[in-house]
UniProtKB/Swiss-Prot annotation:
This is WAP four-disulfide core domain protein 5. The gene is WFDC5. It is found in: Secreted. It comes from the Eukaryota. InterPro entries: Elafin-like_sf, WAP_dom, WAP_four-disulfide_core. One of its GO terms (cellular component) is extracellular space.
């Protein structure tokens, strides 16, 4: 019984010592996020990568227009963007490009008319 208790304690300590970011990521997925993909697909070219581990250093494998390539990652704030129920009648206008462009805990979220800074929702 004592050996089983020690093994269980060791397993719990191993899991508890993992950084929180490790949970929720696929194996081989690097931390951070892909930058927004605003480019139109003008020319179909072969993917340069299929997953993050094929990219050097801290770069991530992300869609850019219509193919995947290794790009610098961006940091992401906690929470998720609220769902947008609107339709846009004017041209797109981006007030931010990444979370770091927004103050405090606000996130750079896509809306019907572009991206803007919004308070995140839990999730």
């Amino acid at each position: 019984m004592r050996i089983q208790s020690l093994l269980l304690l060791g397993a719990l300590l191993a899991v508890g010592s993992q950084p929180p970011a490790a949970f929720g990521r696929k194996k081989g997925e690097k931390p951070g996020a892909c930058p927004p993909d605003d480019g139109p697909c003008l020319l179909s070219v072969p993917d340069q990568c299929m997953e993050d581990r094929q990219c050097p250093l801290t770069r991530k494998c992300c869609y850019r227009a219509c193919f995947r390539q290794c790009v610098p990652r961006v940091s992401v704030k906690l929470g998720s963007c609220p769902e947008d129920q609107l339709r846009c009648l004017s041209p797109m206008n981006h007030l931010c490009h990444k979370d770091a462009d927004c103050s405090g805990k606000k996130r750079c979220c896509s809306s019907a008319c572009g991206r803007d800074c919004r308070d995140p929702v839990r999730g």
